[in-house]
Amino acid sequence: MIDTQQLRAEQLARASDVIRHDDLPFEQPAFIAGADVGFEQEGSVTRAAIAVMRYPSLELVEYKIARISTTMPYIPGFLSFRECPGLLAAWALLEQKPDLLFVDGHGISHPRRLGVASHFGLLVDVPTIGVAKSRLCGRFEPLTESVGSQQPLLDKGEQIGWVWRSKARCNPLFVATGHRVSQDSALHWVQSCMRGYRLPEPTRWADAVASNRPAFVRWQRQQAANVLS
């Protein structure tokens, strides 16, 4: 039996440690990574992928996938406890640690201000940004249909993120401070990693690596061809 009251208390305690201003060891990062977590075998296996990209070229330079036994069932509002063990396993495999990490999920845009981007950022002490595809909490004014339309995401009088339309005719992204990155900088860095898709390149590639999508298959073929040439 999962003690959600204990987990809730831990979330609140950890959330108080999140650094919400810029505490960045760079003027421009050399490497930005994306992280994505999924589940296999009816949820019994956690699959975590991290894709590291050189910045600003956004060239994929390293990726790692970790598969571990899932340690916790799905409980709404406590997803980071389920996802962080897999992310830690993938992180440990990386040879090139990134200067900045985008996580597919929420940062402080969480009812208790501890989404997976914030939780993981605290665990590894790296600047993180939450890039979520759906809203978990908070309210925002309607966006226009124009690319670049944005509104603050507000909850209980506090800005907890940005709602930003990254691509025409697509639902907006929910971008938020994870750890050691301010709200405005979080949006800036996500915007700087766009290449015409709905998702920024780091999390788009993390998803591609995790799911063996065509873009990643083509990249692997090109790498193999480069070795042979």
UniProtKB/Swiss-Prot annotation:
The keyword Secreted does not apply. Coiled coil: none annotated. One of its GO terms (biological process) is DNA repair. GO terms for cellular component: cytoplasm. Mg(2+) binds at D36, D104. Its EC number is 3.1.21.7. It holds the Pfam family Endonuclease_5. It comes from Pectobacterium carotovorum subsp. carotovorum (strain PC1). CDD domains: Endonuclease_V. It is an enzyme of class 3 (hydrolase). Gene3D superfamilies: archaeoglobus fulgidus dsm 4304 superfamily. This is Endonuclease V. Its cofactor is Mg(2+). It is found in: Cytoplasm. It catalyses: Endonucleolytic cleavage at apurinic or apyrimidinic sites to products with a 5'-phosphate. One of its GO terms (molecular function) is magnesium ion binding. Keywords: Cytoplasm, DNA damage, DNA repair, Endonuclease, Hydrolase, Magnesium, Metal-binding, Nuclease. Signal peptide: none annotated. The record marks Y74 as: Interaction with target DNA.
